[in-house]
Structure formats: C-alpha cells, structure tokens
Amino acid sequence: MLKQAVEHRGGFSFENCQRNASLEHVLPGLRVPLARKTGTTIAGLVFRDGVILGADTRATNDSVVADKSCEKIHFIAPKIYCCGAGVAADTEMTTRMAASKMELHALSTGREPRVATVTRILRQTLFRYQGHVGASLIVGGVDLNGPQLYSVHPHGSYSRLPFTALGSGQDAAVALLEDRFQPNMTLEAAQELLVEAITAGILGDLGSGGSVDACVITAGGAKLQRALSSPIEPVQRAGQYRFAPGTTPVQTQEVRALTLELLEETVQAMEVE
C-alpha cells in the first residue's frame, strides 16, 4: 500500500502523477498516453456594422504539419459562423451538430436563429462531456439584437466580449487586440487589425501557420474570404540541385544470384450446381 510521504498543504497536487508512475513500474506494458499540443490561432472582434472572424490554416499532428489549408471557420447559420481551435475532429463535428440543430430550430419556429441560442447549445454540449471534447470556439454573428461575439471553452464556460482570441497563439493575438481595438471601428480598420492579430499569432507560435482566413458578418449576410493574407512566403531555392549521373562514386559493388524454388501449382474447378 502506497502512503503519502508529505502532508498535502494546498496548491498543486501531484498524487496522480505518482500513481501513474507506480502503475507503469508495476504493470509491464502500461504506458500513460501523453497529452499532445494542438496549435491554432483564432480571433474575432465586433466593428460598427457587424462581426469579423479570423483564423490561421495550419493543422498539426504533434510536430508534423498535417494540413496547410485547413478550414477553421465553420458555418452555423446564414448570419452566424464559428471559429474552432483544439482537436480538428471535435471542432468539426461539434459545429456540424450545432448547425443541424439551428436549421431544425429555424424550420420549426419560422424565425432566424439567434447567436445566444447557438452559444447555449454549444456550451451545454461541451459541459456535458466535462472537457473531453477538445473544442475551443469563437461564435460570432448578427441577429435582431445586433452584432455579438462569444468565446466558448472546452469545459462549457463562455464569455461575451467585444474582441477575443483563442488557441496556442492567442497571447500574441490578444496583446495586439488589446492595444489597438476601438469601439465602432470601420470594416477596413477591423479587417486590418484582425489580419495583424492572426499574423502575430502565426509568427509567435509554431503550431499556427499557413495563411489568414476571414469571415465578415453583417446584417446583409456573411462573406467568407480564404487566404486573405499570407504572412509567410515560401522560400525559393538558391540554386539547381540536379546532379549528373556518376557524380557520386561507387565504392563497392556486389551482385548476388537469387535462389528460386519452383513450387507445384494445381487448380481445381469449382463445382457449380
């Protein structure tokens, strides 16, 4: 029986870490799965006529870039969109579920869906799974109450803010938004600020990259813009790396004959009734 050597006095508790290490030592073949870093930079802000959302386009698998043109701005309703950070499959399926529910809600009520309704569906779903669904979401849209922007976290908590950013590159993006955001900004100023915020997240985080996608939502509808800006240009090769045959000398060469064994093969006809 393991006993606690030091009395716990508050603060961080590492009892589970000690338990996992003991189980790995006692049980052969048991390995506790490691947590993987999910890299993304998403942001959004409210301007004078609506809401603008932005995201990078890099999808990673641990230290490998899995997709250079990943769509992280998801459709919910004609005037409501959602940015997703975290596990790509979780964000995709969670937003699809919300979009289908809002379509059924609009058909049954005969009214346009509200941003607060989408946020409630998302946070209740995420709270039900207690954080095991890795989806950090930014919901933005325009309804009868005007432009609204919400951030929803994986455990179900949410906030309504004039601007926000989530993901592994959120520190650089939030720093730029806090410094330059102003109420009642024009569309041009808001779009420029959003692109610079996502670019700051891309340049300051290895998990973020690719180009900048944006979605402008107003009372007249939404406009999704792919590859609005590409902060990182591909590096051009300095020269031609084509070598003529025989450039690399052959030190030794050996030819071995393969021993083949001939097997007898028979084919039997299948009985057909």
UniProtKB/Swiss-Prot annotation:
Question: Which keywords belong to this entry?
Answer: Acetylation, Cytoplasm, Hydrolase, Nucleus, Phosphoprotein, Protease, Proteasome, Threonine protease
Under catalytic activity, the entry for this protein gives: Cleavage of peptide bonds with very broad specificity
Q: What is its subcellular localisation?
A: Cytoplasm; Nucleus
- Signals that turn on the gene: Up-regulated by interferon gamma. Up-regulated by theophylline (THP) and down-regulated by 1,3-dinitrobenzene (DNB), two reprotoxic agents thought to induce infertility.
Annotated Gene Ontology cellular component terms: cytosol; nucleus; proteasome core complex; proteasome core complex, beta-subunit complex; spermatoproteasome complex
Report the PTM annotation: Autocleaved. The resulting N-terminal Thr residue of the mature subunit is responsible for the nucleophile proteolytic activity.
Nucleus keyword on record: yes
Q: Give the Enzyme Commission number.
A: 3.4.25.1
Q: Which superkingdom, per the lineage?
A: Eukaryota
**Record PTM Phosphoserine, positions in chain:** S230
Listed disulfide bonds for this chain? none
What GO annotations for molecular function exist for this entry? endopeptidase activity; threonine-type endopeptidase activity
Purpose: The proteasome is a multicatalytic proteinase complex which is characterized by its ability to cleave peptides with Arg, Phe, Tyr, Leu, and Glu adjacent to the leaving group at neutral or slightly basic pH. The proteasome has an ATP-dependent proteolytic activity. This subunit is involved in antigen processing to generate class I binding peptides.
Q: What is this protein called?
A: Proteasome subunit beta type-10
